[in-house]
């Protein structure tokens, strides 16, 4: 058995019927030119023969019978491959619209905690001789970046490779010995122990709260001159409502070369342009609904602090940067300048900290957010930030599944109470793939955000 870290188990604690805590991915593939009519049936039949999955795909939760101890991961000895791997077909005409409706529905349902917490859906019937794969895994198992790496591991850069195992059957390379010194390892262990105390039993360990606050203050002490956005400066907005079960997922791809050119034109990075696109789109969307706050929206940009040699490791290794989205600024160039300045300040803040300090800081900042989810105040009080906007680097070369080229890879993230919208972006070869997930009830016509993203990009493109 493997003990579930308390920082990971927080995702289980925050989960409810209306806030599933899983992350997903939608991958689009084009059928090979010589694919037989039963190509997908053959693929599915082959996959079902891989019924002895590797970790973390064979791990399920086991709860101790006595006390309030944390659950453990243990191998599922009754693993049912037919439950986890499913075959679906779209109704005609099989447009992307029908695909997104299906993904929206699938993403709104909870994963079964009595089984390993993941599902993969092979979806046929997509127009243009294409098919799709939708996968979801619980956030207590992987964070978004690790999940993406796990899925990529089963794809090949060779179109002629037809024997690649599916992701759940891939043999993982053994972990490399840590290159950190004993002092560094001890520092990380001490840092990790503190959030575990806090998330494990807050009431029973109240004495640890001053220690956490002290650690967080020390983490911030070295960079007080850095003008980064502070938590809980975000205005209440249409986005920050309590959420229902129903989800609406929309997706779009944008040329990476185009975005790079616009960034070069304005002395900005690709990430700066992505954030400016989102800010401009949000300004337009909220203005359409007569709901644009006077104060700027604040975005949360998660950043990975996972060591490079642990790219496919399970669990979570993330911190956050809070940024001014400048949605109260009408001029797109001034808006971009504010976003760049805010992002740089956030990076400087984290850059001035050790890994221990980053973990202390992240726990201190996120603890009230987590408590708000648990006690029901989220969505009813001023938000810590308005929405999460993630930008995750992806593959730089085309990838293939059994000869089928992957056309796009769209992240499908999660929502919280008080956070009815999430935008996650990943790069793939020469494109940036945007995945937008929203509460269907709280945010009407969320597909309009795609039009506004393009309008915001064109607006920056037109300015010299």
Q: What residues fall within each predicted segment?
A:
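Soluble acyl-CoA-dependent acyltransferase catalytic core bearing the H(X)4D motif
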Residues: 1-7, 26-38, 44-419, 423-454, ...
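Generic start-of-chain signal for non-secretory N-termini
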Residues: 1-22
């Amino acid at each position: 058995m493997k003990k579930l870290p308390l920082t990971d188990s927080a995702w289980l604690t925050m989960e409810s019927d209306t806030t599933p805590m899983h992350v997903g991915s939608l991958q689009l593939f084009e059928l090979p030119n010589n694919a037989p009519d039963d190509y997908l049936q053959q693929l599915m039949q082959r996959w079902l023969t891989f019924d002895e999955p590797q970790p973390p795909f064979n791990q399920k939760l086991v709860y101790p019978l006595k006390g309030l101890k944390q659950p453990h991961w243990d191998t599922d000895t009754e693993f049912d491959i037919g439950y986890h791997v499913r075959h679906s077909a779209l109704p005609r005409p099989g447009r992307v619209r029908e695909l997104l409706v299906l993904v929206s529905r699938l993403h709104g349902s909870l994963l079964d905690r009595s089984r390993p917490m993941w599902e993969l859906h092979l979806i046929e019937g997509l127009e243009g001789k294409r098919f799709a794969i939708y996968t979801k895994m619980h956030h207590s198992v992987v964070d978004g970046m690790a999940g993406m790496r796990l899925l990529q591991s089963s794809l090949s850069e060779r179109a002629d490779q037809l024997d690649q195992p599916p992701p759940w059957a891939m043999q993982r390379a053994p972990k490399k010995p840590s290159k950190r010194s004993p002092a560094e390892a001890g520092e990380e262990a001490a840092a990790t122990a503190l959030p575990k105390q806090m998330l494990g039993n807050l009431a029973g360990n109240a004495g640890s709260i001053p220690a956490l606050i002290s650690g967080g203050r020390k983490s911030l002490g070295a960079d007080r001159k850095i003008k980064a956005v502070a938590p809980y400066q975000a205005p209440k907005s249409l986005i920050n409502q309590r959420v229902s079960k129903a989800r609406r997922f929309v997706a779009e791809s944008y040329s990476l070369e185009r975005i790079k050119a616009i960034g070069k034109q304005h002395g900005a990075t690709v990430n700066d342009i992505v954030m400016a696109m989102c800010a401009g789109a949000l300004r337009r969307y909220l203005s359409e609904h007569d709901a644009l706050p006077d104060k700027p929206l604040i975005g949360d940009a998660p950043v990975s602090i996972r060591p490079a040699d642990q790219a496919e490791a399970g669990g979570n290794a993330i911190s956050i940067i809070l940024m001014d989205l400048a949605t109260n600024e009408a001029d797109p160039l001034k808006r971009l300048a504010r976003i760049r300045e805010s992002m740089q300040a956030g990076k400087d803040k984290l850059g001035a900290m050790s890994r221990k300090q980053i973990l202390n800081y992240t726990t201190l900042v996120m603890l009230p957010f987590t408590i708000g989810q648990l006690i029901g105040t989220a969505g009813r009080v001023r938000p810590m930030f308005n929405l999460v906007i993630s930008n995750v680097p992806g593959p730089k070369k085309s990838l293939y599944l059994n000869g089928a080229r992957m056309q796009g890879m769209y992240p499908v993230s999660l929502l919280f109470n008080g956070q009815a919208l999430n935008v996650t972006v990943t790069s793939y070869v020469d494109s940036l793939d945007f995945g937008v997930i929203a509460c269907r009830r709280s945010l009407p016509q969320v597909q309009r955000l795609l039009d506004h993203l393009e309008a915001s990009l064109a607006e920056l493109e037109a300015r010299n």
